[in-house]
Structures are given as structure tokens and as C-alpha cells.
């Protein structure tokens, strides 16, 4: 991920970007996710294949189906049971990020790209309501925490 997000690699091809993310994901599955699942543990990840479906598939125009096909081998059949989409307007998301830290290569993209990404996430949430929970990211953080906690407790029968 460090190479992929390096802002100095501005000429990286979109397919290269997709393949590098799939490779990083394959290693994550091998080293962390699969062993944890095999041990009966719950796994929480901040991003997974849906991010590539949106960023590379929609934002870069490679196609959502292409992204899922490329990642199929890397994921070894593992897909998230639940995804939380922090739904936020693209401009607001950029503004928040600029106030936090130095932007990486993806974060430095134009507003048009980020709008495609937001629209893509919303489309995926509409396509997969059984596993993607859309949360209004303008809500106070305590409310967001409560919503997520409620869904996780219900999913894990806690």
C-alpha cells in the first residue's frame, strides 16, 4: 500500500494500481485474515475489496466486475459479512482529510474522481443492502459509534 499511495508515483497505470491492491490484499488474507477466521475469530478491517471495486472499478473506470474477478483469486473466497459505509459528500470528505494530514496519491485526486467514488460506494450499498450499512458521516461521532456497535452486537449475537 505504501508504494501505491506514494504521491510521487503520479503516472502509475490504473491496472497496475488494481493489481498491486489485489496483491496486498492476498498477503493480508494469507497472513492475518484467514488464520484468524480459521481460529474462529471475528475480523475487522478498515478497507477491503469493495474499496477497490469503487476506486479502481468506478473511479478509474476499470469496471466493478473486473475488480471482483481480479480479486477473486486473492481473496480465497473470503468476503466481508458486513461493511460500514461512512457516507459523506465528496467535497466535505476532501475538506476533512486536508485538515488531518498530508494527502497521499489517491487523496490528491480531483473532486470529480472523489465524486465518482462516493457515487460508487452508494451504488454498492444499494446493490448489497444485506451486508453494507450506510451511515450518515455527518452525525456526531458518539451516534456513529452507537449505530456501529448496535449492528456488530446484533451480527455477533452479543
Predicted ranges, named:
Residues 15, 79-80, 129:
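A structure-centric signal for secondary-structure junctions around beta-strands
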Residues 18-20, 37, 62, 85-88, ...:
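Generic leucine side-chain signal with a strong bias for well-ordered alpha-helical environments
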Residues 44, 82-84, 133-135:
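Hydrophobic/aromatic beta-strand patches that form the interior of the parallel beta-sheet core
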Amino acid at each position: 500500500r505504501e508504494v501505491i499511495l506514494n504521491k510521487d508515483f503520479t503516472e502509475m497505470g490504473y491496472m497496475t494500481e488494481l493489481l498491486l491492491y489485489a496483491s496486498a490484499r492476498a498477503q493480508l488474507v494469507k497472513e492475518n485474515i484467514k488464520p484468524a477466521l480459521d481460529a474462529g475469530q471475528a475480523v475487522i478491517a478498515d478497507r477491503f475489496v469493495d474499496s477497490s471495486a469503487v476506486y479502481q472499478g468506478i473511479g478509474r473506470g476499470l469496471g466493478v466486475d473486473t475488480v471482483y474477478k481480479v480479486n477473486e483469486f486473492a481473496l480465497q473466497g473470503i468476503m466481508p459479512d458486513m461493511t460500514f459505509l461512512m457516507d459523506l459528500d465528496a467535497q466535505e470528505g476532501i475538506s476533512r482529510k486536508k485538515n488531518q494530514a498530508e494527502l497521499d496519491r489517491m487523496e490528491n485526486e480531483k473532486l470529480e474522481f472523489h465524486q465518482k467514488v462516493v457515487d460508487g460506494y452508494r451504488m454498492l450499498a444499494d446493490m448489497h443492502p444485506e451486508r453494507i450499512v450506510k451511515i450518515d458521516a455527518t452525525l456526531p461521532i458518539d451516534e456513529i459509534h452507537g449505530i456501529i456497535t448496535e449492528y456488530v452486537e446484533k451480527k455477533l449475537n452479543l
